[in-house]
A protein has these predicted regions:
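A compositional/biophysical signature of low hydrophobicity enriched in polar/charged and small residues
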Residues: 1-162
Length: 162
């Protein structure tokens, strides 16, 4: 998993319309060459490069990723695993997350408010591998329980944030 993201909540960076345009374009095609990105945003390539670098440096852009199909790399079974932690384990949340996100099965980790503490998006080779992963979670002393839901289909939202 990626390193701890920059926390942009404390001091929200000011975004102007050009920044929003760049973000919209990059969400559509993160591999777009800088020259094309600049032309489509109506700014000079050097300005474009500087703005993208600034948006990355301040944590607005968290990275540029390949969207890999888990089934194409031998992990066709996807599931959402809701995890509830023991009340006395709340102080170990960062340690728990650090351990869990190192597992190859884990695609995403969501920290929740509500009945469950975490929602894990996982991909495994088969039901046996999923069962082993869930059993490993339940064997951890800080885990009170888990609930697993299989994912039949996943569609990424098509609308950019901006």
């Amino acid at each position: 998993m990626a390193a701890t993201p920059k926390d942009v909540r404390a001091g929200q960076p000011a975004l102007d319309e050009t920044d929003r345009t760049l973000l919209r374009l990059l969400q559509t095609d993160a591999r777009m060459p800088n020259s094309e990105l600049a032309a489509r945003a109506g700014i000079a390539p050097s300005t474009c490069h500087g703005r993208v670098r600034r948006l990355t440096d301040v944590g607005v852009i968290r990275g540029f990723f390949a969207d890999v199909d888990p089934a194409a790399v031998g992990r066709p079974l996807r599931a959402m695993v809701a995890v509830s932690l023991q009340a006395e384990a709340r102080g170990e949340i960062r340690h728990f997350v650090g351990e869990i996100e190192r597992h190859d099965e884990v695609i995403d980790v969501f920290f929740l408010a509500g009945t469950d503490d975490y929602l894990l998006h996982v991909a495994t080779a088969d039901t046996d591998a999923l069962r082993q992963f869930v059993e490993m979670l339940n064997a951890r002393r800080e885990v009170a329980g888990t609930t697993t839901s299989l994912v039949f289909e996943h569609r990424r939202g098509g609308a950019p944030i901006f």
